Amino acid sequence: MSDFAKVEQSLREEMTRIASSFFQRGYATGSAGNLSLLLPDGNLLATPTGSCLGNLDPQRLSKVTADGEWLSGDKPSKEVLFHLALYRNNPRCKAVVHLHSTWSTALSCLEGLDSNNVIRPFTPYVVMRMGNVPLVPYYRPGDKRIAQDLAELAADNQAFLLANHGPVVCGESLQEAANNMEELEETAKLIFILGDRPIRYLTAGEIAELRS
């Protein structure tokens, strides 16, 4: 086995492990959600369409080109289009996680969210891990406009909320993207736990210090 093949096999196993962890801990249910990562040769490895994140076969993961051409494995999800849009427009993005996790999806269904940043910072971690979390308007799953909107937002952001749909998070590795997704989900959970109680938000100076 060549060095490249060994790296690819390791990444396949990592994707399967992380996806299974999401499923086992209740971040994903049924066949909802998809993950992807960039391979060293520029191709993309992604979870197949209709697949359960808790029961993936490393050898059947979808491989597609940077242009979206299906190369091998099972058929890729139609949502791979917006994964590709993120990779093309943010060179720091090496992996993408999209889930229908309970708390973030619930947050995406609320009216009156700030489309520029749905989470006003009240803990340091959302600032340190994700920065702003813009809202993408609702479109039917698979609609090309999701990819178009994410492409416009990708350069300056690494976490997004698809209205009435769920979260999308990038990372410089799949593990980092997974960590960022968990931070977003836990922050969304805190928003609902706090409810209408007065929140002590971080000040502009505190946010600037975290970003420096």
Curated annotation (Swiss-Prot):
**Co-factor binding details:** Binds 1 zinc ion per subunit.
Q: Which SUPFAM superfamilies match?
A: AraD/HMP-PK domain-like
Q: Name one GO molecular function term.
A: aldehyde-lyase activity
What is the superkingdom listed in this entry's lineage? Bacteria
Q: Which GO terms describe its biological process?
A: pentose catabolic process
**One family name in Pfam for this protein:** Aldolase_II
- Keyword Ubl conjugation listed: no
How far does the signal peptide extend, from start to end residue?
Answer: none
Active site positions: E79 (proton acceptor), Y125 (proton donor)
Its biological function?
Catalyzes the decarboxylation of 3-oxo-tetronate 4-phosphate to dihydroxyacetone phosphate (DHAP) and CO(2).
- Protein name, as recorded: 3-oxo-tetronate 4-phosphate decarboxylase
